[in-house]
A protein has these predicted regions:
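Hydrophobic/basic alpha-helical segments
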Residues: 1-141
Length: 141
């Protein structure tokens, strides 16, 4: 899709807009559910899609990934997913219906966290969305 727009003579802004609306959104579908379970290799693979899109958009002007991100006004996909998950966790926190999912910490200590993290016995439960979002809320004031 991006290659065809480039062949027809689309501008940089148009190609970035198409990338954001048609391609990037696919990598962010339901990310609060699966982001906590991503491995480092998964993160690299997802980031590679944006890297390839920027190489297509910029063509011979592409030098480094960070420079391409700045030029196109984009951020790392991992940062974007983190922000989306944080917004989702904050909306759960404010929700009358779903705030019961988060258990408040019973005792106050100097390093007390706002929410207690449930005990996990398996790696699958440890990377579940509820645990991930609770840790996310505790790490952000």
């Amino acid at each position: 899709m991006l290659r065809r727009i480039k062949e027809v003579g689309g501008s940089l802004e148009d190609m970035v807009r198409v990338y954001c609306l048609q391609i990037r959104c696919l990598s962010e579908i339901a990310c609060p559910v699966w982001n906590g379970a991503l491995t480092k290799s998964d993160i690299k693979r997802i980031e590679r899609t944006q890297k390839m899109a920027l190489k297509i958009i910029l063509g011979s002007e592409y030098r480094w990934y960070d420079e391409a991100l700045d030029r196109c006004g984009l951020i790392l996909l991992s940062t974007r997913r983190h922000d989306i998950c944080l917004k989702f966790a904050q909306s759960i926190e404010k929700s009358q219906k779903f705030n019961s999912w988060l258990k408040k910490t019973v005792c106050q200590t100097r390093t007390s966290e706002k929410y207690s993290i449930p005990f996990t016995r398996t790696k699958i439960y440890e990377t579940s969305p509820l645990i991930y979002l609770t840790k996310l809320l505790n790490s952000n004031p």
